[in-house]
């Protein structure tokens, strides 16, 4: 684990093809995961804050690959940019992701941000490489009934349906994350020089769609451009405030658009 203080400034082709194909051979969902998906329960959101420039992140990246295969989990890889100065500029690092992580730190009362960090359902803060702790946190979050079950309509570029329900007094933020299925990167410099790193569900955009105050909402997503650029999927997250507990979420593959 590598920490970064708030006060500081932000931190072979054939082989790559083989590794990219190995995304299809991920660990299959557990029996509990399959039961959760079949029951129609809202999925658990797992956000990994990571960087290809951090040498403690690859085990967490591999764990997220495993989690991305589970139907009861919305697994997102958010690459931060504050480690870019230490030798390797992460090609997927973004100040948008760094800002989201900092907001979580404030909401959860943390003194600093660090990588690899996993946030489960906007509530639980974990070191992202501690697999057993992460899996236990997912099971704990799955047992907590969410307020909302979101749905997608694929026609016309996509639309998300948020049912009526009880909203927090301050309302809830509706987020849209668009992500790539996976990337394989041969790192040339920095702490991971010489390593080939795999990343799954790499977030490329994270935008606010609006505010939910308890009413039924149908929000057009206009994902045709993202699909044309080869993006793999999207997730809609309804979250108390801006970085509070997650009230509901759903994910959709963009190749399902009509």
Question: Where are the model-predicted features located?
Answer:
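Active-site-proximal cofactor/substrate-binding loop regions of enzyme domains
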Residues: 32-112
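Intrinsically disordered, low-complexity repeat/linker tracts enriched for polar/charged residues
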Residues: 10-11, 15, 35
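Short, conserved sequence motifs used for protein processing/export or organelle targeting and
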Residues: 91-114, 123-258
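Juxtamembrane/transmembrane-helix boundary motifs in multi-pass membrane proteins
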Residues: 6-7, 39, 176
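Bacterial N-terminal signal peptides
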Residues: 13-28
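Short loop/turn motifs enriched for small/polar and acidic residues
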Residues: 78-81, 121, 155
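N-terminal secretory signal peptides that target proteins for export/translocation
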Residues: 1-10
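Ligand-binding face of N-terminal immunoglobulin V-set domains in extracellular IgSF glycoproteins
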Residues: 118
